Amino acid sequence: MESRGKSASSPKPDTKVPQATAEAKATPAADGKAPLTKPVKKDTQAEKQEQAAAPGPAATKKTPAKADPVLLNNHSNLKPAPTVPAAPSSPDATSEPKGPGDGAEEDESNTGGRGPWPCENLTPLLVAGGVAVATIALILGVAFLARKK
């Protein structure tokens, strides 16, 4: 069952099988026995077909490498910020003062660049601590119940 699963999931084991058969057929010919010309030709044709098929996937593998590294390294769930032109098109847009109803205070509070919780690095520690406390509580509870019986 495992060999079927592996061959169905990846084509690499299939490409190695004809090479192994070609080596097995070539060794009897090297031992001094009569060489079989027809199977060798079939093997070489199969190898040529494999080599012809190999550049196709290699070309498709090169296209993801051309992707923008900034996009590949972006692991945040936040949407990208809209790009703002360096020079505004109209001077009236920049001269408008922001009042209390315009959300000026909200914009100033978000300039720190922090997420919803400033101590994001403590999250794994808190999870591990919670697991440890739960484990201790479970052990003590089982020990207490076993002692009562």
UniProtKB/Swiss-Prot annotation:
Protein name per Swiss-Prot or TrEMBL: Cell cycle exit and neuronal differentiation protein 1
Pfam family membership, one: CEND1
Gene Ontology CC entries for this record: membrane; mitochondrion; vesicle
Biased composition (Low complexity): 20-35, 51-68, 80-97
Primary location recorded for the protein, binned into one broad class: membrane
Positions of post-translational Phosphoserine modification: 10, 90, 95
Record field: compositional bias (Basic and acidic residues): 40-50
Compositionally biased spans, kind Polar residues: 1-12
InterPro entries xrefs: Cend1 (IPR020162)
Organism: Mus musculus (Mouse)
Cytoplasmic compartment segments: 1-124
Subunit structure of this chain's protein: Homodimer. Interacts with AHI1.
